[in-house]
Amino acid sequence: MALIDPFNRKIDYLRVSVTDKCNYRCGYCMPEQGAHPEGRHTEYLDYDELARIIKAFVDLGVTKVRITGGEPLVRKGLPGFIEEIQPYEGLEEIALSTNAHHLDKHAVALKKAGLSRANVSIDSLQPEKFNKITRGGNLEKVLAGVDAGLAAGLNPIKFNMVVMKGTNDDEIEAMVDYGIEKGVEVRFIETMPIGEAGISLMDQHYPMEKIMARVRAHVGTDLIPATGKSHDGPSKNFHIKGTDAKIGVISAVSQHFCESCNRVRLTARGVLALCLGQEDSVDLRTPIREGISDEALKQMIVDAMLKKPEKHFFNENVHNIEFRQMVSLGG
């Protein structure tokens, strides 16, 4: 069996949220009061349950798993969990999305456990502005985490910058320069109308064509389109000639990437979300806790792919996604 949706897209990438809790409160991701302020830890899948679902997906052809949150490093035992799933035959890569606040403490253990690489959310290089965007974040701590990750061999590390008009759009060029200095990829991301947090910031939407025009003006003819197969999915990537740096752009709103979608998302509470921008989902926690067999679980996952929608409707109707929070989906 393989995972094929109704539009003949092969699903080979699973994003797994291990928690919807986060030590930051970025405005486009999480409401100020938190996503589930009254949520119980018993609602979370435990690591054995998560591992069992991941094994089923890998047996069905998934080759890449990304660990997300919330902030995954606030959940204890993450290196051990990665070590548990790393040997699965057919799993080629385990990646992490993090705010890097705790990465300096865990980078070596994560690499030893089998983590391949990390994406770091960093929306400003100015400490006060960074603190404001994240509602309390510490830029110095994050950059120390980045350095620790690079030193541990988590390579490549990618920076994800959500560009917001009037908030941090004045730092596009500075972020490019920092990427060149560190030899990392910087990915610029449009704001997306997901959940009350994301919808509330759509007046700060900064379109991708403006971002790329400024990047091109800054680096000139040294921006070269990247070629070759990649798991980067929606990111359009460019090399900067003469450096180890790359630029990536994710234009979920102005130029959607649905025709090549190869991923689904598993939330920490056991919901299999089939589209980032629609409510289509399947509950896996209940059958797991009721003792479903491995083969029946695989068949349930195969059947779930038949419910995957063709595309999102970010440009047409934001209201169909206001009840989800980005922090629960893991991006």
From Swiss-Prot:
Its EC number is 4.1.99.22. [4Fe-4S] cluster 2 binds at C258, C261, C275. Binds 2 [4Fe-4S] clusters. Binds 1 [4Fe-4S] cluster coordinated with 3 cysteines and an exchangeable S-adenosyl-L-methionine and 1 [4Fe-4S] cluster coordinated with 3 cysteines and the GTP-derived substrate. GO terms for biological process: Mo-molybdopterin cofactor biosynthetic process. Pathway: Cofactor biosynthesis; molybdopterin biosynthesis. Monomer and homodimer. This is GTP 3',8-cyclase. The lineage of its organism: Bacteria, Pseudomonadati, Pseudomonadota, Gammaproteobacteria, Thiotrichales. The gene is moaA.
